[in-house]
Amino acid sequence: MDGVHDLAGVQGFGKVPHTVNADIGPTFHAEWEHLPYSLMFAGVAELGAFSVDEVRYVVERMEPRHYMMTPYYERYVIGVATLMVEKGILTQDELESLAGGPFPLSRPSESEGRPAPVETTTFEVGQRVRVRDEYVPGHIRMPAYCRGRVGTISHRTTEKWPFPDAIGHGRNDAGEEPTYHVKFAAEELFGSDTDGGSVVVDLFEGYLEPAA
């Protein structure tokens, strides 16, 4: 799903300052910021009510202006709260009573997701691949900037994981696939105005096809 959550490579936001090996500071800057991860793993591991990919997708479903005005960790509080209402763990009235006022949630899903591909190709390190040029209305873990682009496999995981486009919607046909590190020339992704170098993207097998 294209949206405000996938801004990498989008023009108009200015240059991103970057210093190699810079100290980015602590993970959490306020006492409450660990809360969304605690809530998320309570819902995933303790209750078994939803998956991590469902959490990612529910954050993507936030109303765009709400998303842009909300701090990073607060988005995940909203996301987990939305899932708890959708799964029947809480009602929105109970949530707003606990919050002491209105508690805007993510928008309802407009997609049922899609099943994992039945047939995929296993790739080897050094093999050139093309990212499938697919526009998906629901959850997907493929950055828009690499759709249709050609890169080289630099690593294949030994583990397999549920296909995000399915499990992110709570489907039971997610299957399991390995992921690959795919190395792209910066020019392949962003054109000749880049400062050179390369970009490595972690992609599921179902997103890839052999490059011609």
Swiss-Prot record:
Its EC number is 4.2.1.84. The keyword Lyase applies. Changing residue 40 to V: In strain: ACV2. Gene3D superfamilies: 2.30.30.50, Nitrile hydratase, beta subunit (1.10.472.20). Transmembrane segments: none annotated. One of its GO terms (molecular function) is nitrile hydratase activity. Keywords: Lyase. Industrial production of acrylamide is now being developed using some of these enzymes. The keyword Lyase applies. It catalyses: an aliphatic primary amide = an aliphatic nitrile + H2O. Heterodimer of an alpha and a beta chain. NHase catalyzes the hydration of various nitrile compounds to the corresponding amides. Belongs to the nitrile hydratase subunit beta family. This is Nitrile hydratase subunit beta. It comes from Rhodococcus erythropolis. The gene is nthB.
